[in-house]
Amino acid sequence: MARSYEYYKKDIRNYLIDKFKKDIKILDVGAGEGTYYDLLGDYFRNIDGVEIFRPNIDNYNLESKYSNVYNVDICDFRYEYYDVIIFGDVIEHLEVEKAQEVLKYAYNRCKEMIVAVPYCYEQGIEEDNVYEIHKQADLTKENMLERYPELELLYGNEIYGYYKKKNLTKGKDVI
């Protein structure tokens, strides 16, 4: 599905508003129906979106919302730097190794990274979108931290978690 759970959305909004100025650059990976733009776009003005499934870009008018919309697989997308990168309901759609590569690439290209995932959630093709298949349907709080040691839990409950970039540096980026 092109949308995500409502859990903690307002908390994420407040967290980012408290931490960052309005003029930052945000990358919303897996833009879907534009949930994070709708959540943040009235405060932060420079938000780019990445969406692999072209019909979502057209059906949800993403090009009228985001500063830039990239119709590309995040595994192949190369970018320089964003203040915040949001992976909202994205990594569960990638094999573990691919998700690890994507997050490792993003780690040194942002000040903050937000990763939102559903726990233990099977999903197949939705609305003719093969990219909706969950390849990590076994995600839990425990294996999220094992698979992605660069992240730490920010908000969560028994069915959904928001993770943020863990500060793994001592004066210089090390990942």
Q: Which ranges hold each PLM region?
A:
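Conserved beta-strand signature within the Rossmann-like core of class I S-adenosyl-L-methionine
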Residues: 110-120
